[in-house]
């Protein structure tokens, strides 16, 4: 239990805050919650768990290079996988398969880019990615952007993130 809280506590707290903000925004606008908002909330939690799990997988790969055997399968991986699966199913029901796949690839790619370049950025990875992906989901759900534009949107954000990561990496090394 302590291991689960240590690894997932802060990211899940960030996701909870994001969901509460969404809830209060809906209440301020005097709008009722519908299935779309619930799907978005599940997506926020599942993407947070995906980010944390990818982070652990990268840690595991680095441990292999250092000849250390510290990787352990524990309850948080099983729980993370189940919640991720639920998030994917919910996303498919509310959005489309294409945007769901883009969403998953994007989260995994951004996580890798952040983690490999700077420890400073790693601290901010969870809230940044939750906000970015939440925004992307809102755009797609509201029909404000179509799939070709969403691909451009993801590409621009990825390039910007990589650029910031590289700059921080150079500053840190310098």
Model-predicted regions and their roles:
Residues 1-174:
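Multi-pass alpha-helical membrane architecture of UbiA-family
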């Amino acid at each position: 239990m302590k291991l689960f809280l240590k690894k997932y506590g802060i990211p899940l707290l960030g996701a909870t805050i994001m969901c509460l903000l969404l809830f209060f925004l809906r209440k301020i606008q005097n709008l009722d919650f519908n299935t779309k908002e619930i799907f978005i909330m599940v997506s926020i939690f599942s993407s947070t768990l995906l980010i944390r799990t990818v982070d652990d997988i990268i840690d595991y790969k680095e441990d292999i290079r250092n000849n250390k055997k510290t990787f352990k399968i524990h309850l948080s991986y099983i729980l993370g996988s189940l919640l991720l699966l639920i998030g994917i199913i919910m996303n498919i029901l509310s959005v489309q398969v294409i945007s769901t796949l883009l969403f998953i690839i994007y989260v995994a790619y951004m996580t890798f880019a952040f983690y490999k370049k700077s420890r400073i950025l790693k601290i901010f990875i969870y809230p940044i990615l939750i906000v970015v992906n939440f925004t992307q989901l809102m755009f797609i759900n509201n029909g404000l952007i179509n799939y070709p534009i969403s691909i451009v949107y993801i590409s621009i954000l990825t390039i910007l993130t990589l650029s910031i990561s590289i700059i921080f990496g150079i500053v840190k090394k310098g």
